[in-house]
């Protein structure tokens, strides 16, 4: 039996450096497919999709809302050819009803320990329209090593440099941030993987640069420290989302190879200034993630925010426009206030204004988004800042400072 696993193309942010990371969702899903089944993986962002080759079953993995329209197009084409099509992934969980119009079956939730029965249903011509495991999570111990051998790593380099591999040490998130749908998708409970499973997976990856994609590592101080102790002997360098603002945690993170952190910058406070400084004190670089268009943002505030980012010496910054994704508090509030402009999901890529801001016009917010990118990278382009981060990896002493070796 042969499965064709497709990761549809989506519109990238205009200002981002053109590099591509190996997708995580498809390789995690592939690990739940029985070993005796052949998998052909196509990342449409990196190679053309041949819609005429033969397979037994088509699986379409969608992470982003802006990816969904193309995924639906692909599903329609294969179904018109008589192929059975199953959809899964984050975007499917956010848009199940729409996806069902383009699918023979949709899988909602996490696939570990569950997908073998879907395969049996397919073989017996009893495929169900919906497999709904939302908030019904498999045992965390059942999450094994992702199946990365389906990837063509030649697609995931930038100027000859191999990009980071993605991996997770936990699922779920105890926080409930207003623009985020993680609580709906993965639950509000922190679900850490066993340390031996995490170490086994990290050790299996033929890459010394990793991205630990957990929504936040700062959910359990004791767990963080034990995780960093466990992975330190692997001597890999990694980036992640926030780490606990604690000297002991930061010390062990640095020793374990923390390279840089994606840190939300939500205001111009001394708290943020000190948060960035403390990362850097431990040799950890910082990429700020900044959402523009909040209800208290006006033109003057956004311009002062960009000035502040330059003052605190961020290594990188990624600007996005507040986007009302389904199943977020932002969506609920804006839907109730009738501030959502349209539901053209291709535009929901966090680089286009799809709602009515409170303190400015849609056009002005789009202009300020462009201003933020252009101003922050005026003196040193993004590609050079990124090159500087990669150069750090060649010098261990620039990553781990004298006091925390």
Located regions from the model:
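Radical SAM enzyme core and accessory elements
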Residues: 2-5, 35-41, 53-57, 77-80, ...
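Alpha-helical structural signal in soluble globular domains
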Residues: 32, 36, 77, 81, ...
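Acidic, low-complexity intrinsically disordered segments
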Residues: 1-204
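Hydrophobic residues within beta-strands of alpha/beta enzymes
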Residues: 58, 106, 180, 210-212, ...
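Radical SAM [4Fe-4S] cluster-binding motif and immediate context
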Residues: 145-294, 298-307
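Flexible glycine/acidic-rich beta-alpha junction loops that bind and position SAM and/or redox cofactors
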Residues: 8, 12-13, 94-98, 175, ...
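Structural recognition of alpha->loop->beta junctions
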Residues: 98-117, 254-263, 304-319
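A structural preference for short, hydrophobic beta-strand core positions in alpha/beta folds
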Residues: 41-43, 87, 240, 288, ...
């Amino acid at each position: 039996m042969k499965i064709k696993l497709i990761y549809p193309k989506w519109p990238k942010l205009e200002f981002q450096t053109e590099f591509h990371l190996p997708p995580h969702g498809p390789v995690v899903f592939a690990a739940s497919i029985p070993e005796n089944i052949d998998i052909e993986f196509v990342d449409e962002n990196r190679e053309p999709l041949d819609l005429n080759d033969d397979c037994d079953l088509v699986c379409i993995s969608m992470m982003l809302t802006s990816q969904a329209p193309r995924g639906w197009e692909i599903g329609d084409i294969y179904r018109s050819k008589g192929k059975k099509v199953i959809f899964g992934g984050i975007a499917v969980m956010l848009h199940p009803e729409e996806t069902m119009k383009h699918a023979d079956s949709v899988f909602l939730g996490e696939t570990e320990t569950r997908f073998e029965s879907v395969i049996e249903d397919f073989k017996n011509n009893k495929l169900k329209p919906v497999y709904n495991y939302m908030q019904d999570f498999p045992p965390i111990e059942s999450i094994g090593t992702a199946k990365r051998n389906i990837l063509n790593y030649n697609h995931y380099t930038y100027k000859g440099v191999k990009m980071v591999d993605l991996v997770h040490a936990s699922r779920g998130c105890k926080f409930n941030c207003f623009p985020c749908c993680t609580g709906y998708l993965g639950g509000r409970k922190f679900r850490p993987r066993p340390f031996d499973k995490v170490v086994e997976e990290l050790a299996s990856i033929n890459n010394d640069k990793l991205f630990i994609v957990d929504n936040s590592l700062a959910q359990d101080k004791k767990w963080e420290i034990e995780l960093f102790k466990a992975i330190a002997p692997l001597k890999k360098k990694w980036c992640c989302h926030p780490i606990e603002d604690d000297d002991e945690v930061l010390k062990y993170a640095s020793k374990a190879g923390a390279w840089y952190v994606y840190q939300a910058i939500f205001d111009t406070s001394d708290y943020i200034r000190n948060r960035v400084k403390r990362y850097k004190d431990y040799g950890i670089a910082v990429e700020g993630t900044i959402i523009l268009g909040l209800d208290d943002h006006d033109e003057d505030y956004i311009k002062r925010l960009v000035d502040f980012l330059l003052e605190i010496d961020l290594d990188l910054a990624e600007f996005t426009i507040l986007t009302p994704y389904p199943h977020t508090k932002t969506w609920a509030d804006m839907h109730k206030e009738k501030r959502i402009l349209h539901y053209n999901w291709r535009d929901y890529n966090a680089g286009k204004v799809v709602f009515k801001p409170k303190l400015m016009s849609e056009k002005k917010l789009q202009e300020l988004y462009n201003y933020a990118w252009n101003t922050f990278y005026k003196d040193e382009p993004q590609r050079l800042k990124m090159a500087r981060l990669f150069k750090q990896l060649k010098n261990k002493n620039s990553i781990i400072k004298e006091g925390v070796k």
